[in-house]
Swiss-Prot record:
Post-translational modification: Ubiquitinated in immature dendritic cells leading to down-regulation of MHC class II.
Superkingdom of the organism of origin: Eukaryota
Region (Connecting peptide): 217-226
Gene Ontology CC: early endosome; external side of plasma membrane; Golgi apparatus; membrane; MHC class II protein complex; multivesicular body; plasma membrane
The organism of origin for this protein: Mus musculus
Protein name (Swiss-Prot/TrEMBL): H-2 class II histocompatibility antigen, A beta chain
Keyword set, alphabetical order: Adaptive immunity, Disulfide bond, Glycoprotein, Immunity, Membrane, MHC II, Signal, Transmembrane, Transmembrane helix, Ubl conjugation
Residues in the Extracellular compartment per record: 28-226
Gene3D superfamilies found in the cross-reference section: Class II Histocompatibility Antigen, M Beta Chain, Chain B, domain 1, Immunoglobulins
Amino acid sequence: MALQIPSLLLSAAVVVLMVLSSPGTEGGDSERHFVYQFMGECYFTNGTQRIRYVTRYIYNREEYVRYDSDVGEHRAVTELGRPDAEYWNSQPEILERTRAELDTVCRHNYEGPETHTSLRRLEQPNVVISLSRTEALNHHNTLVCSVTDFYPAKIKVRWFRNGQEETVGVSSTQLIRNGDWTFQVLVMLEMTPRRGEVYTCHVEHPSLKSPITVEWRAQSESAWSKMLSGIGGCVLGVIFLGLGLFIRHRSQKGPRGPPPAGLLQ
């Protein structure tokens, strides 16, 4: 689906250049009209949320320069456009502004007014807490709250310790773009875990009816060892149970002897 960008957003700017011909040409001082057009286009691929931004520069109804966001730079369509394309590509400000229009123009329209609800997208975040180093009580450590695969970009992530918000020792990465338009962010909390403490990562996002809260509890090394021992015991129990059932099944079949003598006559 191609959406024409409104004129106020550089959709179709038509500039008519009035050039007076030199005396003696075209039979006198008659005016000549040269038409220069600029057109911007946003292409939304149905079902994929992928956007492609294309700008076309047209002189006297002939396109001579084109910018394609899939290419990332201006390309000359005709020899007339080669000097302009080379110049625009050599200017970081121009190239950066043109590349940014994928967001400021196309994505702005996509996320735009509520009247365009058919184009809106909401993706709920996934939230996971991890510890940067092997757990040890009363030693400095870092909790990492990984918030991934959410859209739109607006999100609020907070840390709580035993129900009280933590503001000291909190840091965050910049929003990281995924290839499918979704985002991810990491929010870290510098802390010293003590037995019985409960840390909570609290996430608010437009896609959620209520915030997501994920807890992490500080455990002593003995409690951690007991938990691992319990898991290991369960695994060994399942293995021995399966082995016993297999041996019993084999023993119930019994050895097969030769057929009765009467059947051989």
